[in-house]
Amino acid sequence: MPTETERCIESLIAVFQKYSGKDGNNTQLSKTEFLSFMNTELAAFTKNQKDPGVLDRMMKKLDLNCDGQLDFQEFLNLIGGLAIACHDSFIQTSQKRI
């Protein structure tokens, strides 16, 4: 039986595979696939953005090899960054309660 961490890793892989490949290459997210992922899986984050260009800038910043697509490692950089931001927010909130 997989551990909680192993299940999380499996879920990340499954989500990446769910969105990649619709435009042809199943090892990368195209810009369209990235936008679909963001608007579906991270809808609360996307809806709270006041700047309509934020997703385009995120894609460019995450696309380290500048090929116009996100591979799995670049995708994980997004997930890691969001996890760090959420963790920091959680820590700040819990410290205010003390």
UniProtKB/Swiss-Prot annotation:
Sequence ranges assigned to domain EF-hand in this UniProt record: 8-44, 50-85
Keywords tagged on the record: Acetylation, Calcium, Cytoplasm, Disulfide bond, Metal-binding, Nucleus, Phosphoprotein, Repeat
Coiled coil: none
GO BP terms, alphabetized: positive regulation of smooth muscle cell migration; regulation of cell population proliferation
Annotated positions binding Ca(2+) 1: 26, 28, 33
Residues holding Ca(2+) 2: 63, 65, 67, 69, 74
SUPFAM superfamilies, A to Z: EF-hand
Post-translational modification: Phosphorylation at Thr-5 significantly suppresses homodimerization and promotes association with NCL/nucleolin which induces nuclear translocation.
Family matches, as Pfam families: EF-hand_1, S_100
Subcellular location: Cytoplasm; Nucleus
Keyword flag Transmembrane helix: no
Keyword Hydrolase: no
CDD domains registered for this protein in UniProt: S-100A11
Further comment found in the protein's record: Binds two calcium ions per molecule with an affinity similar to that of the S100 proteins.
PANTHER family reported in the protein's UniProt record: PROTEIN S100-A11, S100 CALCIUM-BINDING PROTEIN
GO CC annotations, alphabetized: collagen-containing extracellular matrix; cytoplasm; nucleus; ruffle
Entry protein name: Protein S100-A11
N6-acetyllysine modifications at: 22
Chain positions with Phosphothreonine modification: 5
PROSITE patterns: EF_HAND_1, EF_HAND_2, S100_CABP
Protein's job: Facilitates the differentiation and the cornification of keratinocytes.
SMART domains hit by this protein: EFh, S_100
Lineage: Eukaryota, Metazoa, Chordata, Craniata, Vertebrata
MF terms (GO), sorted A to Z: calcium ion binding; calcium-dependent protein binding; protein homodimerization activity; S100 protein binding
Main subcellular localisation: cytoplasm
The protein's assembly and partners: Homodimer; disulfide-linked.
